[in-house]
Amino acid sequence: MAVYHLLLSSPPSLLLLPPSPRRPNLTLIRRIPAHPRLGNSTSLLSSSSPVIRKILVRSTLREDQPIASDSESSPTLLIGEDSAAFELGKQKLVSWVYFGVVLGVVLFILNVVWIDNSTGFGKSFIDAVSNISGSPEVAMLMLILIFAIVHSGLASLRDIGEKLIGERAFRVLFAGISLPLAMSTIVYFINHRYDGSQLWQLQGVPGVHEAIWVANFVSFFFLYPSTFNLLEVAAVDKPKMHLWETGIMRITRHPQMVGQIVWCLAHTLWIGNTVAASASLGLIAHHLFGAWNGDRRLAKRYGEDFESIKKRTSVIPFAAIFEGRQVLPEDYYKEFVRLPYLAITALTVGAYFAHPLMQGASFRLHW
């Protein structure tokens, strides 16, 4: 799962529509056309100060029309980017061919350097961690801890790293170190998920399997917003730190954390033993820290823009909507009828039916 996230993850920023000729209804302002002298207002809205954004809004109004205060306009003026926007006409075939080549090369290197027991270091790494205590629960927690330190640590050093070696080189370094650790953790969990002590047994209870399946299906819609910028993940396009605001972000500001918690609870309920509980404990703790660290990094990068989005979003799903801080547009459903979400749907169904293949491949590694 974590491997899939690292391989997957650019949509253009959202433009805003002009208001009606009369006194504007700010609840309807969503797009501002590009000014002929300013060029594309997208980058200005996503990176400029609140004063510049107000000037852009003023350009769509008559001179005698007042501009609402930040508190009045913040629920409607989109500062961040439109998540999951994908325009097929703007895609370049050469970029996706390059993406396929990069993916193939990465998987080949990963197999030689880490996966293949005759040439790679994966088994030696797993054995070293397992021999620390001999307990599968401790080994599971240790693997997650190592991955979390490397993954979150490198993410925290992103600004410094990109200045030193560039965005693309840092992305390659980040993925090159994180990917083997993530795969080791996943394979160990698959191979040892039924070790440890059984805490409960619900697999024979009617309706439990169906409920678990639905929970896992829903979790993937939260887990992988990174599919919004696939070409950046592979460093085909220059990687950027995005400030998403629409789609799943309206429900929760940290969809990966929510998705991981749902996934962990579902699998722990189904497996019902100490190894699954240990894995869930480690993964949830890592994502809770990641949510805090992510907010910290976005606040440092975007300043007031992030604070404005933070005020009208929530960490707890639907909280901002119920509290009235997030006002959903009438056509909100259209933010989900997009290719990335359709791809997630297909991949989630495919992953379910591919479980026997994943389990067989993991078992053959003897990790």
Curated annotation (Swiss-Prot):
TM regions (residue ranges): 95-115, 137-157, 172-192, 211-231, 269-289, 339-359
Reactions performed catalytically: 9,9',15-tri-cis-zeta-carotene = 9,9'-di-cis-zeta-carotene
UniProt tissue specificity: Expressed in leaves and at lower levels in roots.
Induction comment: Up-regulated by light.
Keyword Lipid metabolism assigned: no
Keyword set includes rRNA-binding: no
Topological type in the membrane: Multi-pass membrane protein
UniProt protein name: 15-cis-zeta-carotene isomerase, chloroplastic
Organism: Arabidopsis thaliana (Mouse-ear cress)
Origin organism lineage: Eukaryota, Viridiplantae, Streptophyta, Embryophyta, Tracheophyta
Record gene name: Z-ISO
